[in-house]
Amino acid sequence: ILDAIDSGKITNTEIRVVICNNEGAYALERAKNYGTEGLLLSPKSFETREEFNQKLLEALKEREIDLVVLAGYLVVVPPCVIQEYENRIINIHPSLIPSFCGKGCYGLHVHEKALERGVKVSGATVHFVDEGTDTGPIIMQKPVMVEQGDTPEVLQRRIMEQAEWKIF
């Protein structure tokens, strides 16, 4: 997304903050390189989940965020944030929802399940976030062919390159 804004592919858009729960994530370095604020905010840094939830909501409100884009964010978005930003939180999921989604279906697990099932087509889905896991209304999907001999890692890379990076 940062690259698309930088190249002019996406216009009239500003990324005000990149929020990450993983201190070593490349996203924070990329944000810094683009002159965008990077904010490390992990549930592990708070005594209770409620404290984290409120801090996350405050961080978004303080920066007057219009749209929340989840890209590799593996923390469950708290209900207080979903309610405050109803129909303004979008996520990318590395499968064609409703296949291979929901609790436990993230990262390589998605592609392992797809290959175990023997699907011929997988892909990516952009959807609104609601209080379920990968259950919000679908905005867009892009299919990607599964090839003979694919490993989860190879399929993951192909889906990122041919679908996720194109539609998100």
Locate predicted features.
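One-carbon transfer enzymes
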Residues: 1-168
